[in-house]
């Protein structure tokens, strides 16, 4: 594990100089999605937690690309997207806590799952997270009440910060409903918080993530 100051420096340098896929540049135009909070229900609801320092509530590195890819796969009229915002501010320091995020952020994700369950009872829920957002989802999903957890059909985790600690899965959630995507060279997946350029490439894997999530929802 590295010091917070070094992590800040790494993220700043990589954000400024690291290669960014074209799809990620397009997604920067819109980094938020709040369908649930706007009262919109569709057959499939994607709830996503962005990575540290990303703006909006979805982020451009993995969140919005996954939302867009899932809409392309299933149809825009079939998919609602909701980012985890509010108390989850995607700050850097919570990465260094025992759960790699803080309880307020986990609770905010749980709030979104509860909203989807109560507001859209017939919807099939899928979820995702990137970087610190994977820890947010990990902490939330493993503690969901069974009646809500059973409606979460699939989860994708990009650059899973608890990949080593949790053995590549979310505790108390079916492993076959979870896809961990780790880019070659992403040391975060090896149990460190060392940020390499590979950690910024996950827009490239949005199609793969969407394929997995689509395979977990019924037609």
Curated annotation (Swiss-Prot):
EC number: 3.1.1.74
Keyword Hydrolase part of the UniProt annotation: yes
Keyword annotations: Disulfide bond, Glycoprotein, Hydrolase, Secreted, Serine esterase, Signal
Disulfide-bonded cysteines: 41-120, 67-81, 182-189
Signal peptide: 1-17
Domain of life of the organism encoding this protein: Eukaryota
Subcellular location(s) of the protein: Secreted
Catalyses which reaction(s): cutin + H2O = cutin monomers
GO BP terms, alphabetized: carbohydrate catabolic process
An MF annotation (GO) of this entry: cutinase activity
Site feature (Transition state stabilizer) residues: 52, 132
Gene Ontology annotations for the cellular component aspect, listed alphabetically: extracellular region
UniProt cross-references to Pfam families, sorted A to Z: Cutinase (PF01083)
EC primary class: hydrolase
Active site per the UniProt annotation: 131 (nucleophile), 186, 199 (proton donor/acceptor)
Annotated Gene3D superfamilies: alpha/beta hydrolase
Family classification: Belongs to the cutinase family.
Protein name per Swiss-Prot or TrEMBL: Probable cutinase 4
Organism of this sequence: Aspergillus terreus (strain NIH 2624 / FGSC A1156)
């Amino acid at each position: 594990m590295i010091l917070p100051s070094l992590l800040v420096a790494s993220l700043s340098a990589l954000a400024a100089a690291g290669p960014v896929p074209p799809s990620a540049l397009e997604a920067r135009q819109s980094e938020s999605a709040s369908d649930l909070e706007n009262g919109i229900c569709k057959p499939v609801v994607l709830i996503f937690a962005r990575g540290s320092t990303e703006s909006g509530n979805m982020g451009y590195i993995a969140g919005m690309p996954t939302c867009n890819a899932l809409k392309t796969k299933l149809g825009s009229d079939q998919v609602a997207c909701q980012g985890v915002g509010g108390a989850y501010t995607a700050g850097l320091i919570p990465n260094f806590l025992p759960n790699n995020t803080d309880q307020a952020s986990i609770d905010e994700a749980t709030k979104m799952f509860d909203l989807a369950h109560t507001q859209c009872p017939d919807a099939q829920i899928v979820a995702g997270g990137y970087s610190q957002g994977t820890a947010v989802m990990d902490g939330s999903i493993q503690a969901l009440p069974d009646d809500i957890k059973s409606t979460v059909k699939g989860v994708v985790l990009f650059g899973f910060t608890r990949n080593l600690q949790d053995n590549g899965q979310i505790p108390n959630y079916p492993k076959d409903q979870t896809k961990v995507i780790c880019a070659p060279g992403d040391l975060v997946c090896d149990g460190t918080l060392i940020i390499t350029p590979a950690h910024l490439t996950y827009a490239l894997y949005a199609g793969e993530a969407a394929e997995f999530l689509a395979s977990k929802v019924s037609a």
